[in-house]
């Protein structure tokens, strides 16, 4: 089994990222970190209004710091989910030299993931138009460094988990590479100011 330092899970809202992360956590028995797992913050100085860009940047920088802390302490197969898709392009920059894999979940059956979103527990985001746009962008974009794609269409969550584990355990990540970030237009972002929704 090829242990990784980091396992990133990306994909459209409602496609099964959280379900996969929970399954991987049970399998690898390590740790799972989501970008939204940071302390509550309202502004930097008590008066400055919070912008979407600053909020996302704060979440991203905090996530990277947490991940590097766990890595420094010797954790392996650190599962990372729920990052802004635009940050997917930063993974090969920030984590170069580390053993990581990015699992991009897509669906060639938009109706399947629409139904998954419809049945989301805990009042998760329900926005079918955004989900469709996110998935379409992910289907069009070529894989990045150390990124693999799993089409969830027609698969149960158990089948997706099994496929993900097989990829994680066998894929050998590149540690050294040349990388040029793809155009921003190939990604989506929950930050309205990025203009990628």
Question: What do these predicted ranges mean?
Answer:
Residues 12:
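P-loop (Walker A) phosphate-binding loop of NTP-binding proteins
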Residues 58-96:
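Glycine-rich phosphate-binding loop used to anchor ATP phosphates in small-molecule kinases
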Residues 22-65:
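Conserved substrate/cofactor phosphate-moiety recognition/catalytic segment
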Residues 9:
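Hydrophobic anchor at the beta1->P-loop junction of P-loop NTPases
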Residues 15:
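ATP-binding Walker
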Residues 18:
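Walker A/P-loop
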Residues 97-117:
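Conserved phosphate-donor/acceptor-positioning beta-strand/loop module used by diverse small-molecule
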Residues 122-163, 172-193:
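Small-molecule kinase domains that catalyze NTP-dependent phosphoryl transfer to phosphate-bearing small molecules
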